[in-house]
Amino acid sequence: MNESASQEELRPAQENRKEDKERKWNLTEVKELHETLQSVPDVPVKEDTNSVVEKAMDEIKSQELNLEGQRKISPGSIKDSKTEASGNIAIRKSAKVIFALDETELKSKPEHTWKKNLFERMEARAQAMQQKIIDKENLKKELEKKAEKKLPRDNLAKEWFNTDSMTLNNTAYLLDKLLPTLVPGVENMLTQVEKKKVLTEADTPSKFDPINYLGEYLIRNNPNYIKDPGMSGYQRLMKEVTEDLKIYVPDTICNRVSKMKENVKQNRKQRESIDKIIVKVANTRKQALQEQFDEWILDPKGMIPKSVIQNVLQEFFQNPDFKLGSHCKQLDITDSTEPRLNKMEFTEYISSHIKDLKSEMFEELLKHLCHSADEFREVIKADMRRQMFAELFLHCDHGKVGFLDRQRTLALLELFYDHSSQMLRSLLRNPRQWPFIEFEEINLTELWGDMDNQKHIYEGFDKVLLEMNTLLSANHASKTQSKLLESPDQPKLNEQRTSTPSPNPPEQQRGVTAEQGPQRISIEEQQQGKKPTAEQELYIESVIEPGTHTESTLEQGSSRRLLTEQETHRESTTEQGQHKGSIEGQGPRRVSVSEQGSSRESVAEQGSRRESIAEQDRHKGSVAEQGSRRMSAAEQGSLRESVIEEPYQKSEQGPYGEIISEEQEDIGSTSQSRKDSILKSTKYGEPITSEYIEVPLQEKRSWEQTYEEEIFLSSELQEEVPTLSRKDHFPETTKKEVQKDKPCEPKSQKIEGKSWSGEFFTCNWKMKYVTFEDEEQANLIYGNSRFTDLHSIIRNIQSCKEVKGRTAFNGVSFNLLQFVQLLETFVGEDAPLSVSETLTSFFKEGYVETEQEKMNALEQFSQNAFQVRQRLLLEAIFQKWDSDGSGFLDLKEVDELLYTYKEGMEKESMKKAKLHIQFPKPHPGHEVRLSSKQFQNYIELVVSELRGNEDQVLESVVEFLMNALERSHIESLRNSARRKWLHQIQCAAETSGVSLEPVYSETFKALMQDAEAHGNKKISAHISLLEENLLLPEKGNVLLRNVACTLDDAQFVLNRVLYRDMKGISFTVVDEGKPIHVPQVQYHGNIFFWNQSRNKHDYNGSFLALPLQDAYMRIFGVLAVDTLRDPHEINIFLPHEIRFYQGVANVFSTAYHYVHSREHILHIVITGIGWLYDVTSSITSITTYFVEPSPAQDSDYVLRNMMVTGQLGLTEIHKNPPTIHRKSCIFRDFLFKCTDSSEVVLASACGETHIVVPLRERTGEALGVLDFNIGQNRMLLCQEYKDLQKMMKVVQVACYEILGEFSGEIKKKYILEIENVREVQRAGILFFRIMLLELQESIQLLNSMEFVSLLLYDHTLVTEPNSPQDSKSMELEANVKLVRDILKAVILFFHPELEFSSDFGSWDKCKFYVNKYLVNNICAFDPTAKHVEVNVQLIDEYIRDHSRTEVWKFGNVVIEHLYHWIHICSALMKITKQLNSGITPPLPSKTDNYMYAKMPGEGLQEK
């Protein structure tokens, strides 16, 4: 104990001594270092080397001894600097005051304090030790550097450096172990030898032995035992050589370290070089992007909308050839066009998205940017044109009613088209053809169409366009030159010549046909008999270039999509002035529909015309001369002239006083009836006199003259019209040259001489011009304090609108969107803006409404506003009344409340209203339920029967009902929440991409949320649908299959089947059609439990089964809800819960049929596409889109890409369809233009032509879009274009029928036997059924003499004398074979037994089967009936050798109808045989990304 205590007492004293020594050593180190740095003497040059070495060695030894002494100091003697300072300075710390702390906290505080102090002292010592070691190392390096400076380097040691692999190891070993001691020893030995003069005195014996001396030296200086006293210059260099040589010794640490250092060095250099290259490439790319920025058209501030660049990048990244889809995730396209980018921001933004692109991809991006810059220029041009047309609509809408008359608009377009020059007409589209006229206005015969494959819609377009561009450039050059040469008075003279009217146009003007264009030479020059100028000659020659006698001159409507009028052979101009010739046909040959430029007449008139074309009169206005026309029977009886054309027919002094061709004088019943309808089709049918349509004489002449100057002299158009229109109008060689030289061309910041204002409404221009009536009426209701209680309900109704932003097509009027789209389609994409300006001025002068029309328009506007207001108010009343969301009201309850209106004074009037409405059938409980629509109809009739102003009466009734319906705040909140959940079910169906899975999920979600929030229950639910029992018919004809259930019950319920002979009340619900509620299932005895493993004592709960009904009140399934999983003992369903569950069942039924209606439409489209692909070959792809509500609140709708059909006819159906947003389609906005206006859009994108056709709902709004991509082709051939129209007409009719059936508006029609099989299969054959019915109706309208003429045609051929075989006789023989084969094929359908009869080979005996019963049999024939047994292969053999072109050339309507009837019957028979494998529903699984389908069809032979 004493020893330990004494030792502990000695430790502080020893530590104090060590600290004192440490201070001394620190002071001495500093002094020695200071002296060493200052006491290094300069070595003289002539000083002896050995003495210098010895002095240096002595100094180094002394310094190293000092270092050794420092190493002996204990590390523990280092003292903290704070401790040293505390020995001199005393600091008094302030005391801490602690309030209300626990004892545990007080005890823990000192512990943390001493630990903290200990850690601080330890850290300070460690830092001091580390710093001391660093200082020592630095001092040692300084001493070595000094020694190197003092000692001269002996380069002889470098001779030891030899990397020879043979001696490398040995050399390294010697240099490292032996030579550092051996060399100084030899040197020392030689010095001694020299001192003792052993070599000089060789004969004198000496005791000095050099070997012994060397050995003694080596022993004394063994490096393992003796510290290195110092090194000479030779040794130091040898050491360096040793270190360098060790690097080359393999498998050593130095070698590996050196390799690592070398790799690191190389990687660093490579990284630096790569960084330099990256920076250089980035700068080069930025410079290229800055140069490319100048090719874009900019706003006045020199900026581009950011969304445009985002669209460009997205389109580039989505190119499948580049495989850059991952880059699209980084793009977040903005909704607004307000954010703009200047040149630097443009460069930085694009650079940030293309950092990892290769050089090849960057070059492709530059090309894409250049192309997009040109496309954006066209987009701005189209935007300027659309704004121009929108302002025109507002100008023509004098009453601000929001719509213009459709017939008047089309008539003005026809008038503008007829009086346009030939060159300008080549840029316009024909307003008498589709898509300007609707399918309902086209007869079936016309749709079978022109089969001439050699005729093209855009025949000769390139030539006309190039001539026009050449002329524009020539005129621009000549104008520029003439401006430099003309005198100051010359412009005035030119103006006088241009503006001088002609009182009497010369006769030679009248000789120019309208086909050549009513081009005029200067009137002053005509009167003086002067020749036209060179510029005018060039223009006139370009227009009349085909000559005075042309064949099939094409009237082209637009550079993109023109439905042309292919005219018949025309006589010369002089012959036309004297006598109008008609076409002389031989035999039954028929003139092409597209050549005639108008539609066919009725079937009876067509038949007579085909037989006597050559015998018709050749007077002006004859039917053969004008071309066949499409008109109804009443229109054929009496043709009335249009009042709009009267001024131009009466006046010869105006610019329209020229004689136009027969085609323009009689332009067909469609335009004639359309123009006549302007005079007679008012609301009340009152005629409109011509004085309201005609412009006063002087005013008419002035605007006609202005129009003439603008349209007939439109060769000059504008001074700065670009010489090249859109690049994809030229042939491939020209296109390549243009694209090659395009980057070299300077980019003007003007579009046809006009600067861009910076306004860009391509994505959201509806916000500026379009207003929707329901929103305006809702705002008016919000401002009316009488309906305060309904405001919140109406807001919910407006927010839950299905799809916003669409306009409905009604066939009577155009709203702004439709009007703008119509004019844009008429003008086309390539017409200069001056043409649009001319059309705008023409419309402003020509669109004149009578006072009666204006009043009718205002009445219609107010009526529409009243209907919208009425619908909103009545829907709000219905929802307030139906507070539980059941979806119906009791008629008895409604009547009881209505009869109290005005204290019962209007009771009799309300009873009269009930006589005009058909109420639904009473339910089993004698309860008549009114849906929302039926309730609105009932209240509308009540309002119409009450006395007073209709608007005031409506408001009074609504206010009475609103005040009579007292609802508590809790009921209102519950109603609002339930409405929201019900809306989510319907929204799930609309946004599901044609899938039922989201509908099931939202249905169960609504049930569970309501049970939890308003019933405090835990429920289970499942949906079972009725199916036909094919496997076990003895258990019943139908069964219930559980198709969906809540997640907890999936393993027990999903896909299970309930038969009629099993327990359960579900079939009772199906039979009775009313809900059944079982409060306590354990006591019922007829409940089937799916989970048989459950203990019988746990069967405690309620069960509710609800019927699922369609629009015809037919039951198709059961919705079951139970509370077996609820832990509460009392868990019965309350009345308000049952009513809400009925509402859920009702909304689910609507959503279910909504999805299936879209599914059936897809089947119809697939069938139509299959038929179209069998008869056409120019269509590259067909993409089908459906319209869905947008998930964003500020957007209107989105498009879902449902399926894509490739060039081979294989349809790829997407299970999870991609979503297309408007903001990402700036360069492909034609899809949204079509959906907005519900009109056909003809557009081009990326060098490909698109024909976009809407699929309309029964209301006229677009429910989908079909995008026909025809690739690089400018337009389809006439034959294929007619086939496209036929396909779309049938598809649209089938869609109307499907939608009407699902909504309950029309009753289902089962015409063919195959339609009774299944719903999906029925949708697949609906396309062919409609085509079959149309043909049967057309055949039924034929005259019996039409069939007899076929037999007489054969008889006349037989009675002809034998003549040599020439082309005419061969043609007649081919026609006879055609007639016989088609009639034999038809006979085989009804008399299949003749196949084995010898009479069938004799035509004379087969003739007897062509009798009066044949037409009846054809019109009543069902090719899908089970009793029909026909040899389809034999029938195909008879018609296989005859193409559609051959049938068309024959020109007999009977043969044509029968030919198509045979093909459709054959296709239906094949579908019937392939029923199970041919049509597969694409629903409802979403496990795969896509599936493929190809519908069976019957192709028509093409030759």
Curated annotation (Swiss-Prot):
UniProt keyword list: Calcium, Metal-binding, Phosphoprotein
Modification Phosphoserine, positions: S77
Comp. bias intervals (Polar residues): 549-561
Biased composition (Basic and acidic residues): 8-23, 562-582, 607-622
Domain EF-hand: 869-904
Molecular function via GO: calcium ion binding
Binding-site list for Ca(2+): D882, D884, S886, E893
Residues covered by region (Disordered): 1-23, 477-518, 544-656, 730-750
Domain of life: Eukaryota
The keyword Membrane is annotated on this UniProt entry: no
Protein's recorded name: EF-hand calcium-binding domain-containing protein 5
Source organism per UniProt: Homo sapiens (Human)
